[in-house]
Amino acid sequence: MDTLPKAKVLVVVTVGGSTNSAPMLEVCVILASRGHTIEFATLEGRQKFADPYPFVSAVHIVGPAISAADEEVHYRRFSTWDWDTAAGKRDIVDGKIAFDAFWPETYRRLGDVVRKTRPDFIFADYHVEAAVDVASDFRLPLAVMWPQMPWLVMPQKYIPGQSGMQQRCLTSEKASLTDRLFEMTFLLRSAPYFLRWLFFVRSMRKKEGVPPRQKQPKPDHLVLTNSYYGIEVPRDTPPLVHAVGPILSESWPAMGEPFASFFAARKRICYVAFGTHVILDSAQVDKIMRGLDAALAAGVIDGIVWSLSAVARRRIESERLSSSSSAVGDRRMTVASMLANEHPAWLSCTWAPQRAILAHGSTAVFLTHAGPSSANESVFHGVPMIAMGVFGDQMNNALRLEAAGVAVRLQKKDFTAAQLTEGVTRIIVSERDDFERESARLHKIAAVASRRRFLAADLIEEHLYDWDGRFEHQLLGREPRGVEMEDGTSSPLYVKDADFYPRGRELRPMHLQTADVRMSWVKLNNVDIGLLLCSSAGLLGGFIYMIYRVSNL
């Protein structure tokens, strides 16, 4: 019989979409089955993310809605992501600032939610910096879900530059000197742009009276990554950091019409999807259409399913791309005719049942932006990819998928239609055995690793119970002490946020935290012992020298 106390877990997702919330709520399926209460906090208009999960007992709003127009402007900017140019780096920083601008209101309103609902644990998306601050303010245990290993922490000597920001090489093992130097100097070369972001964040926090967060080499809270080794670069991680992915739903929508008929009639289909937010420009759409049409004409593939979001379609129409064409034989195909489904081998749509498509035996290759969910789903179902990262972690995901042997990587800036045709041909014809072998290998790894969602739930409980027990007063399973306020809510006897949960003194550190983060640099590196040994050696040498001098008098 389970006698462990039950807790209230507050899941927080703000600027992230369903890609961010779904894996977190899948972990919460397990927590809810164990008797824990799950509540969800998000921005206005995003309450729907919790709809598929009936165990979510309450939804809280911690920020304003992002208008469709603002979101489109934001992702148009992100879709021009470029590490190499001044304008590109400026756009990257502008996009990051736009996301971080939600911090003040999220920080205030999330604090209000904590005061009102008294959660025992915060489970936050990695975009929600405010959750880290609120957890610190209230001395609450915290877990953060990342799509990959977190940036700017846990440096490794064998990983050049900043983890998650590599553009050329993932490790130093086979990298050239120039590539290693390129990766290691990236932040230095980008300093003017990133300093602007740092100053913005510092100013924003100062206005709220929140001091800058101290930089640490390791996370000081539980970190769960929706990734796995095989795609993720193996590295030394502290006990507070765990790869628990791929976290995927065990069921998915069935393939209805017109997809079922289209797939039943074909054997080698290329599925194309760039996610909800990627907005391709006219040149990219034109090259993709011509590259795939050439592969179709050559008989490499016999069908194409292209899922284009409504926003992406509007851009095509606004740029009058419909006149772009691809001539094969005695026919001429335009983007407009492709979107209108006037060609029997092409199926265009604004939404596709992606899991059902990837699970279908006729899906031969997936042309993708290499977003975390798409990459995990494709590997899980054993479908090789043409990976063309567009922004953010997609760029590094594409590099990792290529290194794992399950993808051909294209550079979004300068790829050609011929390169796309060649990539499809490599996967399906010329290097078919290699890609099938690697895809089958990673499929099996992903199938086993997907069970780690239970590990994620276990770690949350473990961290929760350790946190509750390492303070003077244990609070789980007890009625909160409080006084009745004028508005009918209960408030603790203490006023300060740090005393809102009357835990008392901290008796011991987190059981998963390594001792080095609490040690001084001198003690950690045994500098004092080195100085003592050097001093002792000097004294001994001086003593021997004195004896030598005296003996020669």
UniProtKB/Swiss-Prot annotation:
<comment type="similarity">
    <text>Belongs to the glycosyltransferase 28 family.</text>
</comment>
<dbReference type="InterPro" id="IPR002213">
    <property type="entry name" value="UDP_glucos_trans"/>
</dbReference>
<feature type="transmembrane region" description="Helical">
    <location>
        <begin position="527"/>
        <end position="547"/>
    </location>
</feature>
<keyword id="KW-0328">Glycosyltransferase</keyword>
<comment type="function">
    <text>UDP-glycosyltransferase; part of the gene cluster that mediates the biosynthesis of the depside C-glucoside verapyrone B. Acts as the tailoring enzyme responsible for the C-galacosylation of the aglycone alpha-pyrone precursor to produce verapyrone B.</text>
</comment>
<keyword id="KW-0808">Transferase</keyword>
<dbReference type="GO" id="GO:0008194">
    <property type="term" value="F:UDP-glycosyltransferase activity"/>
</dbReference>
<dbReference type="GO" id="GO:0016020">
    <property type="term" value="C:membrane"/>
</dbReference>
<protein>
    <recommendedName>
        <fullName>UDP-glycosyltransferase</fullName>
        <ecNumber>2.4.1.-</ecNumber>
    </recommendedName>
</protein>
<keyword id="KW-0812">Transmembrane</keyword>
<dbReference type="InterPro" id="IPR050271">
    <property type="entry name" value="UDP-glycosyltransferase"/>
</dbReference>
<dbReference type="Pfam" id="PF00201">
    <property type="entry name" value="UDPGT"/>
</dbReference>
<keyword id="KW-0325">Glycoprotein</keyword>
<feature type="glycosylation site" description="N-linked (GlcNAc...) asparagine">
    <location>
        <position position="376"/>
    </location>
</feature>
<keyword id="KW-0472">Membrane</keyword>
<keyword id="KW-1133">Transmembrane helix</keyword>
